[in-house]
Amino acid sequence: MTKIKQEIYNKRPTSPHLTIYKPQISSTLSILHRMTGVALFFVVSILVWWLILSKYDNNYLQLASCCIIKICLVAFSYSWCYHLCNGIRHLFWDIGYGFSIKAVNITGWCVVVCSILLTMLLWV
C-alpha cells in the first residue's frame, strides 16, 4: 500500500464495536425468540420420542421423577410460554400496533413477566 493510500485508510471512520453496544430489550427478545423457536423444534422431537418409548417401557416414564428431567421440563415450558407470548406480541405488530419505542419496551417486559407467570401457573 502506498503512503497516501495508507493515510486515507487510517482516516476512515470506524463503526462502533459490539463491546460498546448496549443491548436493548427488543434486540434481546428477538434473539431469544429465534433461539427458543429452534430449541422447541428439537425438544418437542425428543419429547415425542420419549413419550413413545415410555408407552413400551416404564423405565422411561420413571425418568420424569428425576430432578434434572424436571428442571429440563420447566425450562421447556418456560421456552414454550415465552415463545407463545412473544408470538402474540408479533401478531400485534403484524396488524400495526405497538411500534413506538415506549410500547416496544413495555410489551417486551410484559412478555417476560407473562411467560414467567404462565410457567409458574403450569407447574403449581
UniProtKB/Swiss-Prot annotation:
Compartment(s): Cell inner membrane
Pathway entry: Carbohydrate metabolism; tricarboxylic acid cycle
Residue numbers binding heme: H83
Keywords per UniProt: Cell inner membrane, Cell membrane, Electron transport, Heme, Iron, Membrane, Metal-binding, Transmembrane, Transmembrane helix, Transport, Tricarboxylic acid cycle
GO molecular function, one term: metal ion binding
Disulphide-bridged cysteine pairs: none
Keyword flag Transport: yes
Gene3D superfamilies, A to Z: Fumarate reductase/succinate dehydrogenase, transmembrane subunit
Topology in the lipid bilayer: Multi-pass membrane protein
GO cellular component: plasma membrane
Details of cofactor binding: The heme is bound between the two transmembrane subunits.
Transmembrane parts of this sequence: 30-55, 68-88, 104-124
Requisite cofactors: heme
InterPro entries, alphabetized: SQR/QFR_C/D (IPR034804), Succ_DH_cyt_bsu_CS (IPR018495), Succ_DH_cytb556 (IPR014314), SuccDH_FuR_B_TM-su (IPR000701)
Periplasmic-facing ranges: 56-67
Ranges of the Cytoplasmic topological domain: 1-29, 89-103
Quaternary assembly: Part of an enzyme complex containing four subunits: a flavoprotein, an iron-sulfur protein, plus two membrane-anchoring proteins, SdhC and SdhD. The complex can form homotrimers.
Matches recorded under PANTHER family: SUCCINATE DEHYDROGENASE CYTOCHROME B560 SUBUNIT, SUCCINATE DEHYDROGENASE CYTOCHROME B560 SUBUNIT, MITOCHONDRIAL
Function: Membrane-anchoring subunit of succinate dehydrogenase (SDH).
Family assignment from sequence similarity: Belongs to the cytochrome b560 family.
Stated name of the protein: Succinate dehydrogenase cytochrome b556 subunit
Annotated source species: Rickettsia prowazekii (strain Madrid E)
Gene this chain is encoded by: sdhC
